[in-house]
């Protein structure tokens, strides 16, 4: 690509795709600049193959005789078809299949950017909304017999159940566990005896601000717990696509960091385009019609102290330009659904809105990119039946949850992030504990509650690939595209970069493909459902079957 053309594009604020740049280099410098000048007049910010399809008429007028045909041939655009049906319809011919795929993506929930002033009363309303939503779920559970409100509990001993929000938690001098629970009518102390091992173990993992149901006996003075019931996200019926299509799940690309594994990321893009691997691998790659990117797409600027020492791109917009340049290479029939994370150019408080045009304008120029909030709920639709719902959440709450839950901290859940997601599903909430993440309270709905149960939940943040199944919900945790940072070494994290989970949406079978090697790609794990379990075969471990319950 000629340096003069690149400099001219930069002066015009235009991002030039590598493939188009190489084609333009075959024209005279004057003609190439004329084309770029025309692009800037059309308010195009990215010059790629798709742009030439859309603006065929305008570009024909300024190009020399035969030049348009030459450019189209080199870019792989079918000019024979466009001549038969007119240039205007060329776009629909080239993009008809990809547009169908974008119509198959329905955004069910994506939070907007609130501008309202937040007051103390908004937090009060927020917790009341959370309680009411969880109570509606819990009161359907048959285990909660004789359900009553706290203000209706008498001083006489009796058996009953209550639903409340955990206001306090402490260990008594006799090593029993005491919870203070509140509902909209009052508070009550409940005791979990250490001799009831199963209930006691369950109670140890309860976080403050969780909404739970308890069954037992007692009076207004003291209530003794026999059973704890959590809200539990339960998928009653699994949903499958009618079409044989797959979804790939990635996150934590961290473009702009010196640790960004660009070569491996481009290798993944080459694979998804069907240009890498043996015939079977290429065939499987072309089944991927959806790419979910779950946050931390760039490394950002000023996210943590002295970050600039580890950055090779120190401007946020330039980081997004680089990201857009990479994503623009992905074939156009792949719908890319992208939500932000803590390193992206949006507010840190959750729910985080979709990436805006101020810094991430290059992404808005890509037709096959769908920008959603964090969290977001997306459906891949079927024609005549329910589609497959996918809940995206980057996962800022995962580390605070691990630190606050004994059982997760003990098993070092940073290495098995699906266990943290299981905890979220049990509590039906992405961040049960107040202050674990900064959030914006909504007086109408708890946007971090799992109100609509998904078929698949996908997360990132911990830089470890992992898959699991819980209550029929498929859990997919993404890897990263960044080598180990000094911070991760300091805290003892062990990232596994360049590993991509692929889910067949027709069968719900899962593969994890490794792009970390220089020469070849390898399926390192394959999983299939058997009833309520996910049976996985891990390559290189004597083909043992690992049962994930």
Residue ranges and their predicted role:
Residues 1-549:
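Extended recognition/assembly regions associated with phosphoester-bond processing machinery
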């Amino acid at each position: 690509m000629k340096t003069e053309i690149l400099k001219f594009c930069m002066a015009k604020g235009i991002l030039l795709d590598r493939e188009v740049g190489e084609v333009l280099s075959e024209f005279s410098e004057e003609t190439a600049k004329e084309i770029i000048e025309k692009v800037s007049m059309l308010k195009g910010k990215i010059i790629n193959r798709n742009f030439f399809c859309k603006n065929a008429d305008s570009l024909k007028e300024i190009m020399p005789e035969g030049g348009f045909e030459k450019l189209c041939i080199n870019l792989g655009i079918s000019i024979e078809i466009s001549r038969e049906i007119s240039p205007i319809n060329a776009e629909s011919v080239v993009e008809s299949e990809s547009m169908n795929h974008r119509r198959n993506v329905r955004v069910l929930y994506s939070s907007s950017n609130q501008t309202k002033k937040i007051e103390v009363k908004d937090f009060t309303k927020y917790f009341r909304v959370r309680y009411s939503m969880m109570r509606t779920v819990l009161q359907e559970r048959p285990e909660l017999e004789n359900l009553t409100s706290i203000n209706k509990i008498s001083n006489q001993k009796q058996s009953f159940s209550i639903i409340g929000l955990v206001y306090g938690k402490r260990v008594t001098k006799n090593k029993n566990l005491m919870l203070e629970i509140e509902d909209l009518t009052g508070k009550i102390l409940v005791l979990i005896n250490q001799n009831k091992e199963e209930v006691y173990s369950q109670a140890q993992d309860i976080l403050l601000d969780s909404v739970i149901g308890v069954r037992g006996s007692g009076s207004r003075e003291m209530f003794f717990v026999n059973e704890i019931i959590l809200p539990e996200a339960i998928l009653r019926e699994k949903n499958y696509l009618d079409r044989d299509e797959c979804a790939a799940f990635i996150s934590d690309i961290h473009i702009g960091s010196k640790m960004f594994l660009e070569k491996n990321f481009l290798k993944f893009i080459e694979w998804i385009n069907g240009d890498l691997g043996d015939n079977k691998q290429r065939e499987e790659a072309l089944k991927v019609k959806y790419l979910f990117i779950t946050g931390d797409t760039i490394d950002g600027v000023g996210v943590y102290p002295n970050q600039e020492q580890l950055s090779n791109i120190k401007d946020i917009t330039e980081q997004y330009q680089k990201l857009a340049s990479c994503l623009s290479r992905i074939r156009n029939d792949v719908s890319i659904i992208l939500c932000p994370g803590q390193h992206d150019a949006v507010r840190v408080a959750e729910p985080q809105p979709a990436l805006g045009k101020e810094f991430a304008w290059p992404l808005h120029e890509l037709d096959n990119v769908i920008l959603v909030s964090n969290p977001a709920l997306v459906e891949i639709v079927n024609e005549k039946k329910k589609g497959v719902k996918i809940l995206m959440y980057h996962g800022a709450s995962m580390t605070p949850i691990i630190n606050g839950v004994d059982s997760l901290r003990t098993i070092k859940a940073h290495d098995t992030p699906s266990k943290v997601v299981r905890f979220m599903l049990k509590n039906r909430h992405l961040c049960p504990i107040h202050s674990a993440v900064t959030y914006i309270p909504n007086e109408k709905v708890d946007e971090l509650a799992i109100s609509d149960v998904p078929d698949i939940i996908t997360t990132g943040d911990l830089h470890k690939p992992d898959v699991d199944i819980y209550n029929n919900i498929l859990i997919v945790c993404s890897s990263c595209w960044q080598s180990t940072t000094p911070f991760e070494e300091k805290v003892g994290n062990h990232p596994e970069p360049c590993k991509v989970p692929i889910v067949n949406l027709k069968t719900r079978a899962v593969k994890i493909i490794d792009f970390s090697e220089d020469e070849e790609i390898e399926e390192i794990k394959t999983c299939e459902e058997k009833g309520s379990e996910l049976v996985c075969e891990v390559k290189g471990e004597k083909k043992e079957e690992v049962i994930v319950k």
